[in-house]
From Swiss-Prot:
Changing S115D: Mimicks phosphorylation state, leading to localization to the cytoplasm. Residues 22-304 form the Protein kinase domain. This is MAP kinase-activated protein kinase 5. Keywords: ATP-binding, Coiled coil, Cytoplasm, Kinase, Nucleotide-binding, Nucleus, Phosphoprotein, Serine/threonine-protein kinase, Transferase, Tumor suppressor. Changing L337A: Constitutive active mutant. In a knockin model, mouse display increased amounts of head dips and open arm time on the maze, compared to littermate controls. Residues 409-440 form a coiled coil. The gene is Mapkapk5.
Length: 473
C-alpha cells in the first residue's frame, strides 16, 4: 500500500469538535501557514497544538512528509488529522481545511529558551546541536529535505532542563529528487546555492541567459548550511551573515557575504569558545555543497562527542536578552518568507456555480451549510487591506531592529518613510495612535529622537492586537 493511501486512510472526516475543544483565541505561535492554536482532547483533557491548513495537494503533501518523519523523538509528533469545513471571517462560505493535531511543545522556541537561560554553556549548545542533527538525519535518510530549518522551527518539549528539542513545520519540505528548484528560505539561514538557483531563475525569466536544459538545483545540503548558521548564533548571539541595509529583499552586501562564505569569529564573543565548535561551523558554512559536512559528518564530529566539560558560559543568552530583538528579527524573517511565497500561493478560485466538486455541487443544491462546518471569527484570512496593514507594520519593526547603514538624518528619514506607510493603513488603531503620540509622531515624521527598540516592541503589540480573533460564534 502506498504512503499516500495510508495517509488518506488516517485522515478523519468526522468533525474535530466531537473529540476536541478548540481555543480560538489562544495562539502558540505562527507557522508559515498561519497561527497554531490550542485544542483539548475531551476524553482525557490533554492539551495539544492545532494547525489549520487549506485542504489542498500542497497541504496534504506537508502532512504526508511530516507523518513520515514524525516517528523520531526529535521531531514534533502528529497525533491525528481531520478534514473538515471551516469558515473564517470574510469568507462567504466554509472552505475545506485540514486540522492537524500535534503534540504540545510547552518549552518554547530555541532562541527564546536561550535568552531566558543566563548560564547557557557550550556543552548545552553541543547537546542541542546533536538533537537537531539527529532529526535532520532521520529526514535525510527518508530522502526528505526540510528546507526551512531556523530557530522558530525548533521547539522544546517542556521547561525542564533536560527537555528534548524537536523539529517542526514541514510546510516547505520536499522529497529530494535533485530538483528542489523553488527558492524557499529565510535570509539569515539561506545557503549560497539557493541564492544561485534564485539568480538563475530570475535571469531565465528575464531572457538574459538561455534556459538551461539541466536546471540548477539544490538539495539536503542546504539544511546543513542552515544548521551551521544556527550553531553560530547559539554560540555568540548574532548571525554570521547580516546586512547593514534594511531591505525587503536580500541586499547585495548580504548576498555577497553568503555567496563567498565571508564570516568571522569576532574575538570579543568567540575568545572563550572552543576550536572544535569553530571547526564544525567552518565545515558547515562551506560555499560548495560537496565540501560541506554531511549529516553523518556532523554527528561524528568531535564537538558533538567531546568528553571535555565545555562549561564556558556563552555570550548568546545575554546578547539576545539585552538587545530584545529576537522577536522582531523573527517577524522580519516571516515577512521575507511571505514575500518569497507569493508565487507559490496564488490561487484562482472558481465561482460556486461552475465548480466541478460533486460534494460542493450537492451542498449548493441542498442550500444548507455542511454538517461538519465550523464557523469562527478570526483575522488570519482577512481582507487584502488588513494583510497590507500588517505588512507595513512589520516593515517598521524590520527598520527598527536591523543593523543600520549609518547614523543621522538618512536613517531617520527611512524610519519616517516606513512609519508613514504603516500609519496610512492603520489610522483606526487606537493602540498605535496613542503609542505614536508618546513617540512625538506628527503624522509625517518623528519630531524627537526615537528609541527604536521600544518602538519595535510597541508595533509588535499592535500586530498582536490586530491578529487576535474575536470570540467564536
Amino acid at each position: 500500500m502506498s504512503e499516500d493511501s495510508d495517509m488518506e486512510k488516517a485522515i478523519k472526516e468526522t468533525s474535530i469538535l466531537e473529540e476536541y475543544s478548540i481555543n480560538w483565541t489562544q495562539k502558540l505561535g505562527a507557522g508559515i501557514s498561519g497561527p497554531v492554536r490550542v485544542c483539548v482532547k475531551k476524553s482525557t483533557q490533554e492539551r495539544f497544538a492545532l494547525k489549520i491548513l487549506l485542504d489542498r495537494p500542497k497541504a496534504r503533501n506537508e502532512v504526508r512528509l511530516h507523518m513520515m518523519c514524525a516517528t523520531h523523538p526529535n521531531i514534533v509528533q502528529i497525533i491525528e488529522v481531520f478534514a473538515n469545513s471551516v469558515q473564517f471571517p470574510h469568507e462567504s462560505s466554509p472552505r475545506a481545511r485540514l486540522l492537524i493535531v500535534m503534540e504540545m511543545m510547552e518549552g518554547g522556541e530555541l532562541f527564546h529558551r536561550i535568552s531566558q537561560h543566563r548560564h547557557f554553556t557550550e556543552k548545552q549548545a553541543s547537546q542541542v546541536t546533536k538533537q537537531i542533527a539527529l532529526a535532520l538525519q532521520h529526514c535525510h535518510l527518508l530522502n526528505i529535505a526540510h528546507r526551512d530549518l531556523k530557530p522558530e522551527n525548533l521547539l522544546f518539549k517542556d521547561n525542564s532542563l533536560d527537555a528534548p528539542v524537536k523539529l517542526c513545520d514541514f510546510g516547505f519540505a520536499k522529497v529530494d529528487q535533485g530538483d528542489l528548484m523553488t527558492p524557499q528560505f529565510t535570509p539569515y539561514y539561506v545557503a549560497p546555492q539557493v541564492l544561485e538557483a534564485q539568480r538563475r531563475h530570475q535571469k531565465e525569466k528575464s531572457g538574459i541567459i538561455p534556459t538551461s536544459p539541466t536546471p540548477y538545483t539544490y538539495n539536503k545540503s542546504c539544511d546543513l548550511w542552515s544548521l551551521g548558521v544556527i550553531i553560530y548564533v547559539m554560540l555568540c548571539g548574532y548571525p554570521p551573515f547580516y546586512s547593514k541595509h534594511h531591505s525587503r529583499t536580500i541586499p547585495k552586501d548580504m548576498r555577497k557575504k553568503i555567496m563567498t562564505g565571508s564570516f568571522e569569529f569576532p574575538e570579543e564573543e568567540w575568545s572563550q569558545i572552543s576550536e572544535m565548535a569553530k571547526d564544525v561551523v567552518r565545515k558547515l558554512l562551506k560555499v560548495k555543497p560537496e565540501e560541506r559536512l554531511t549529516i553523518e559528518g556532523v554527528l561524528d564530529h568531535p564537538w558533538l562527542n567531546s568528553t571535555e566539560a565545555l562549561d564556558n558560559v556563552l555570550p548568546s543568552a545575554q546578547l539576545m536578552m539585552d538587545k530584545a530583538v529576537v522577536a522582531g528579527i523573527q517577524q522580519a524573517h516571516a515577512e521575507q518568507l511571505a514575500n518569497m511565497r507569493i508565487q507559490d500561493l496564488k490561487v484562482s478560485l472558481k465561482p460556486l456555480h461552475s465548480v466541478n466538486n460533486p460534494i460542493l455541487r450537492k451542498r449548493k443544491l441542498l442550500g444548507t451549510k455542511p454538517k461538519d462546518g465550523i464557523y469562527i471569527h478570526d483575522h488570519e484570512n482577512g481582507t487584502e487591506d488588513s494583510n497590507v496593514a500588517l505588512e507595513k507594520l512589520r516593515d517598521v519593526i524590520a527598520q527598527c531592529i536591523l543593523p543600520q547603514a549609518g547614523k543621522g538624518e538618512n536613517e531617520d528619514e527611512k524610519l519616517n518613510e516606513v512609519m508613514q506607510e504603516a500609519w496610512k493603513y492603520n489610522r483606526e488603531c487606537k493602540l498605535l495612535r496613542d503609542a505614536l503620540q508618546s513617540f512625538s509622531w506628527n503624522g509625517r515624521g518623528f519630531t524627537d529622537k526615537v528609541d527604536r527598540l521600544k518602538l519595535a516592541e510597541v508595533v509588535k503589540q499592535v500586530i498582536e492586537e490586530q491578529t487576535l480573533p474575536h470570540e467564536p460564534q
